[in-house]
């Protein structure tokens, strides 16, 4: 109703500091990232009257950390496609859900996540048609479906690292107890996988790309810490 919308607008304009949190209801419904553009425009207009910010409402540990690392390495926070040899950003086309629902994958690597409990059934069915590798600290739904399963210790408990708060502030996490013998961190596992991939490409005479990606200069608190993989 129009009267209700007027009440909402009055409440937003009369507050001293407002926050618009958005989630999958905007990003995965009709319109996709265009919905976010409208929400950003709303926040911009509200700042003419009062103080307003907009932020995604993330639901799992260190999701912001993954977005921050993607952003400083590629310039884009997520939905990054490297198939052309350089990063391309196309939300609504290149997100994991979109790729899996279309069946574009021929293998899937899951790192510290559980799409088996959250992704649409059509995406999971297409994922299961091809090799599935999981790197997870928990035996969750997707780990039980994996063809290859790598257990890992928990960041902030069994090894030190950095996690990012929902407002992108880095928090240093300390090691509390020793990890079980022989259990590698996700960083160590990925480093070994990358080394094997590059060795195979060298044997085939294929270019191996950059040996190391250097992020741009960050604040000292960020540069001194390693983000936990998510």
Feature-to-residue mapping (PLM):
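Non-catalytic alpha/beta scaffold blocks inside enzyme catalytic domains
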Residues: 1-51, 75-77, 81-230
């Amino acid at each position: 109703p129009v009267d209700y919308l007027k009440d909402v607008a009055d409440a937003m304009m009369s507050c001293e500091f407002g926050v618009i949190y958005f989630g999958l209801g905007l990003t995965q419904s009709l319109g996709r990232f265009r919905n976010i553009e409208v929400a950003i425009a709303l926040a911009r207009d509200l700042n003419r009257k009062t103080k307003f910010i907009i932020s995604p409402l993330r639901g799992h540990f260190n999701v912001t950390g993954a977005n921050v690392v993607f952003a400083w390495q590629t310039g884009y926070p997520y939905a990054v496609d490297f198939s052309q040899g350089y990063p391309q950003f196309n939300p609504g086309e290149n997100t994991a859900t979109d790729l899996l629902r279309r069946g574009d994958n021929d293998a899937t690597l899951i790192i510290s996540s559980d799409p088996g409990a959250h992704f649409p059934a059509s995406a999971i069915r297409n994922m299961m048609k091809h090799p599935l590798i999981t790197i997870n600290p928990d035996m969750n739904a997707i780990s039980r479906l994996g063809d290859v399963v790598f257990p890992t210790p928990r960041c902030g408990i069994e090894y030190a690292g950095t996690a990012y708060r929902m407002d992108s502030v880095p928090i240093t996490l300390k090691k509390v107890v020793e990890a079980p013998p022989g259990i590698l961190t996700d960083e160590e596992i990925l480093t070994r996988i990358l080394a094997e991939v590059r060795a195979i490409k060298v044997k085939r005479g294929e270019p191996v790309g950059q040996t190391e990606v250097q992020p741009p200069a960050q604040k000292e608190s960020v540069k001194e810490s390693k983000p936990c993989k998510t």
